[in-house]
Swiss-Prot record:
Protein name: Peptide chain release factor 1
Organism (species): Sodalis glossinidius (strain morsitans)
Subcellular locations according to the entry: Cytoplasm
Family: Belongs to the prokaryotic/mitochondrial release factor family.
Source organism phylogeny: Bacteria, Pseudomonadati, Pseudomonadota, Gammaproteobacteria, Enterobacterales
Protein function: Peptide chain release factor 1 directs the termination of translation in response to the peptide chain termination codons UAG and UAA.
Length: 360
């Protein structure tokens, strides 16, 4: 293992000892926010240091076995020990490199999930409804809470656009790979001649950011309109102008919220979504600058960034980023997304490891 990696691991071991002392400090214990943050850091550092200590032990075992090779009576046993320890050392080094990969601090957060119908008219809106149902089913299996923040319904079902808040620690870390263009190929129910139509939707996943970390938004940059809430088919579901539409004038971003009966609550939700969008745009801009020479498995959320195709006649789903094709569309559309998400996460991790190995 490279000396630079060993140095990083030794520094983390020292940091773990520091955090352990801090966790016993009465001043830290009385500050619950700091205590929770340090407890979380301690748990993460403990995973690394346990693995590192095991690595050192295996190194010592190898050194002892090499010494025993000089003894004719112990040579066979020493050779067996060297083979076993060598394999163990290689595995531990891989584990340590994975543990050293930079963590996205947003991964442990909840998220906002946005699904927009693209090209394809009514069929695109129906597909947006299918995608939202797919994500809702996935959330159900993990016992996540999904709450619609804003919805614009299609004339014949589905959604023109739907924004939902997914409340659970770690939701963003799993769903962030869903951002991008999703394409569907199927025969619409209204198609009498059995022709396959192609429609598209865009999915954007943004971390839910605590209010203290949201970008500062100048009130003068906002145009706030109120209107009457409406449901599917356009019928009004409220007799007061409680729905809110916020336009961020510098960027043109528009967020609507009509889920609550209270105008104040709708405004708070809309501002939270707007803040998340603005922050996501800034993070994406930075990532593009930093990784211009490396492929990015994290979709941008742009319509042109097609990440996946769902072909219903063939029962096939293809993720274009990693060239993965599964003939299990029925299961995927019912929310069994781990068979897609896990391979993408593994590929993403492999890319990060490749980048780590290139650093001096």
């Amino acid at each position: 293992m490279k000396s630079s990696i060993v140095a990083k691991l030794e520094a983390l071991q020292e940091r773990r000892e520091e955090v352990e002392v801090l966790l016993g400090d009465p001043g830290v214990i009385s500050d619950q926010i700091r205590f929770r943050a340090l407890s979380k850091e301690y748990a993460q550092l403990s995973d690394v240091t346990r693995c590192f200590q095991h690595w050192w032990q295996v190194q010592e075992d190898i050194h002892t076995a090499e010494h025993l090779l000089q003894d004719p009576e112990m040579r066979d046993m020493a050779q067996e020990e060297l083979l076993a320890s060598g394999a163990s050392l290689e595995q531990l080094e891989q584990q340590l490199q994975v543990l050293l990969l930079p963590r996205d601090p947003d991964d442990e957060r909840g998220c906002f999930l946005e699904v927009r119908a693209g090209t394809g008219g009514d069929e695109a809106a129906l597909f947006a409804g299918d995608l939202f149902r797919m994500y809702s089913r996935y959330a159900e299996t993990r016992r996540w809470k999904v709450e619609i923040v804003s919805a614009s319904y299609g004339e014949h079902g589905g959604f023109k656009e739907v924004i939902a808040k997914v409340s659970h620690e770690g939701a963003y870390g799993l769903l962030k790979f869903e951002s991008g263009g999703h394409r569907v190929q199927r025969v619409p129910e209204t198609e009498s001649q059995g022709r396959i139509h192609t429609s598209a939707c865009t999915v954007a996943v943004m971390p839910e950011i605590p209010e203290a970390e949201l970008p500062e938004i100048n009130a003068g940059d906002l145009r706030i309109d109120t209107f009457r809430s409406s449901g599917a088919g356009g019928q009004h579901v409220n007799t007061t102008d409680s729905a809110i539409r916020i336009t961020h004038l510098p960027t043109g971003l528009v967020v609507e919220c009509q889920d609550e009966r209270s105008q104040h609550k709708n405004k708070a939700k809309a501002l939270a979504v707007l803040g998340a969008r603005l922050r996501a745009a800034e993070v994406q801009r930075r990532q593009q600058e930093e990784s211009s020479t490396r492929r990015n498995l994290l979709g941008s959320g742009d319509r042109s960034d097609r990440i996946r195709t769902y072909n219903f006649p063939q029962g096939r789903v293809t993720d274009h980023r990693i060239g993965l094709t599964l003939y299990r569309l029925d299961e995927v559309i019912e929310g069994k997304l781990d068979m897609l998400i896990q391979p993408i996460m593994q590929e993403y991790q492999a890319d990060q490891l490749a980048a780590l190995s290139e650093t001096p």
